[in-house]
UniProtKB/Swiss-Prot annotation:
Protein name per its UniProtKB record: 6,7-dimethyl-8-ribityllumazine synthase
Record-stated family: Belongs to the DMRL synthase family.
Gene Ontology biological process terms from the UniProt entry: riboflavin biosynthetic process
Organism encoding this protein: Oleidesulfovibrio alaskensis (strain ATCC BAA-1058 / DSM 17464 / G20)
Pathway assignment: Cofactor biosynthesis; riboflavin biosynthesis; riboflavin from 2-hydroxy-3-oxobutyl phosphate and 5-amino-6-(D-ribitylamino)uracil: step 1/2
Disulfide bonds: none
Length: 156
């Protein structure tokens, strides 16, 4: 097999600054995501002093805050954590779609990695599973993705 130069990110958060956006809506789930992200970054050498938690009402507000945080130059990465649980109306679809598109747009336009930890589930049980039980913790996964992406981008 041909050997290729490979660029990979190291999981070392030392010296990096993170903005963690967390929604208040469904906070009983979101708080578990935040705990997972903070714990993960700390285990990777990050300092709690280099993490800023920003609380917002809901997922729809996340992109505008992420945009301002990314543009500030104060953060190496933004981690967006929230939970949108399907209800009886189409509101879920509008919020989930626009928040998702907006967060992706922020990352592309700013060049600052944005971790997508917005749960979009059909039931409360599914959200709980993804916030630290059977489905792992998506807050950890979002933090890990941001950390690895930061370290890869440093090498490009």
């Amino acid at each position: 097999m041909m050997h290729l130069k490979t660029i990979e990110g190291q999981f070392d958060a030392k010296g990096l600054k993170f903005a963690i956006i967390a929604t208040r809506f469904n906070d009983f789930v979101v708080d578990r995501l935040v705990g997972g992200a903070v714990d993960y970054l700390t285990r990777c050498g990050g300092s709690r002093e280099d993490m800023t938690l920003i609380r917002l009402p809901g997922a729809f507000e996340m992109p505008v805050a992420a945009k301002k945080l990314a543009a500030s130059g104060k953060y190496d990465g933004v981690i967006a954590l929230g939970a949108v649980i399907r209800g009886a109306t189409p509101h879920f679809d509008f919020v989930a779609n626009e928040a998702t598109k907006g967060l992706a747009q922020v990352a592309l336009e700013s060049g600052v990695p944005v971790g997508f930890g917005l749960l979009t589930t059909d039931t409360l049980e599914q959200a709980i599973e993804r916030a630290g039980s059977k489905g792992g913790n998506k807050g950890v996964e979002a933090a890990s993705a941001v950390l690895e992406t930061i370290r890869v981008l440093e090498q490009l």
